[in-house]
Amino acid sequence: DMKYVTEEFYIPEAQIPRWEYFKGSKREKRVRADGFEYFYTEGGMAFPDSLDSPSRTIITSEGGKSPDRCRHVIQDQTGRLRRLIPLELERLNMFPDNHTYHPEVSDGRRAFLMGNALVCGLVTRVGNELRARLRKREVDSTNLV
């Protein structure tokens, strides 16, 4: 819901190259303090994140404004790039809207909490399946005689 998106979530044009660097593939020669040389490599990621594909996992570093490889960035209906707001993170994890809201809790902390969460709907489905199997097991065990 765009009415909850404030300017602070939009990525300034000047920062976009830095975001592209963090999200891009790398093969960089590095040198440890002891002089050992090695190559740091990592594959590229989508930038911005696709709105038509399943989301990547939300991790605890999701909050914050600085460019980061793991933070989700989308191009919204305004055409601008932005980070996800806490409400969107809650929805991705299938929590009720504003589940993490409290006047004394920052947006960064709310994002951290969602990064530490499990997707509620999946946990519910697994729990329901376990319950059904345990009940079936109880019924089957009473028919042994």
Protein language model regions, located:
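C-terminal target-recognition/interaction regions appended to catalytic cores
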Residues: 1-145
